[in-house]
Amino acid sequence: YKWNSHAVKKKFGDYSFSLGLVWTPSERHMVKANVGRSFRLPGANELAANGVHHGTFRHEQGDTNLKSEQGWQMDASYNLRYNGFSISVSPFVSWFSNYIFLRPTGEWSVLPHAGQIYRYTGAEALFAGTEATIDIHFLRSFNYRISGEYVYTYNCDEHIPLSFSPPFSMRNTLTWQRKQVMLYAEWQSIARQNRVDRNEDRTP
């Protein structure tokens, strides 16, 4: 019998902290800022997986040499509310000295219909992006919301994007509400993603 995984004994130690600031210059404006350091222990699957993940039906392999994930985060937000109109903008940036992620290897699995092998690995990585939302309340019972989000990822070790990077997306929502009755229509737009890892397909 061939074992797919072996016993792993690991010890991890690290620290995390966060600091935040809220400034309200008036009742219409609010500014927030946060900075922090985080760490995450690799999960059992990231350390010892070796087989088909039946949720995604791909062959995933762990790495017993993975160290804890370590990173620094900074984010801010600005909120404005004025006569039925509100806007919120939240930029952020994160830098990881050891970001743990799953990436395609280009090596084909010997397991039937499993495709290429995806392996957990660690790398220096950068994330940056923003989220924005605009709300407009009109005609007493209607509200229109448009929101968008964008995330930029970068593998600093290999100077390429990280795998599974989400594309830019927007969501439009029109809501009608009166007393306890509410109706809404929603439309979501998702852009192409051409910033992909090696051995990863672009999304149309």
Model-based region annotation:
Residues 1-9, 12-23, 27-73, 86, 134-137, 141-150, ...:
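Surface-exposed extracellular loop regions of Gram-negative outer-membrane beta-barrel proteins
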Residues 18, 22, 30-32, 45-47, ...:
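Residue-level detector of the transmembrane beta-barrel scaffold of outer-membrane proteins
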Residues 92-96, 109, 113-197:
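Gram-negative outer-membrane beta-barrel transporters
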Residues 22-28, 69, 79-83, 135-143, ...:
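Structural signature of outer-membrane beta-barrel channels/translocons
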Residues 15-19, 62, 72-76, 87, ...:
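Hydrophobic, lipid-facing positions within transmembrane beta-strands of outer-membrane proteins
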